[in-house]
Amino acid sequence: MPTAIKTHSPEHTSYDVVIIGGAMLGSSVAWFLSSNPDFTGSILVVEKDPAYEFCSTAHTNSCVRQQFSTEINIRISQFTIDFVKNFRDYMGGSPDVPDLTLQSFGYLYLADNDSFADELRARQKVQERCGAGTKILTPEELKADYGFYNLDDIVLCSLNTENEGYFEGSTIFEWWRRSAGKQGAEYIANEVISMTKSANGQKIETVTLATGDVISCGTVINATGPRAALTARMAGIDIPVEPRKRYTFIFAAERPLD
């Protein structure tokens, strides 16, 4: 049930918030903002690929883990897990909203040297303080439960099978996008090609679209994912974001797994 996306020019020439990028990140911001009773402003979402064919959202595995080295990343993941498990409640409780589950297949990190092993131990302590179920295992301990691994060159293992795994990210994205539209966020198929800043250089005052429209704005949100650095440069900002390939490998076991 896709939301109809307006093409080309927006309805107005001024918005409180302009979100550049309408995929998972942009639609998340649009939904959370439009759902917040304290926010009464206008929202414009500018998406240059309205079919979402080339965005990272369309290619993600939609997986979540808690095995990070910083508390903020762990807490963000834990909020994500709670959101997935209680998706219907977060979206208003309607029976039309699907119930989602988290398929906790777990994440396993293997250290083949003492330096990385020490890093895994340090990370586990942070994760444990945050309530994550990460366990540090010797190769022998891991082998006892997962006998199909060849661990000859491994010195330490970090494993968490609780609240780490896959969820239906595409469903969340579609409901965010559609609900944000119903709550007043305006989606258009267009592209931001430049920005102008205030006299003191501290604020973006307008964005110019590929159609030539110049839009005044209170706040601009960069939600362009791997293209975020290119978008930021329009505002004279350099950020360390770049697209990188990620690979998923699916193995067929030579012998049936126990």
Residue ranges of each PLM-predicted region?
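Flavin-dependent oxidoreductases
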Residues: 28, 91-94, 195-203, 209-258
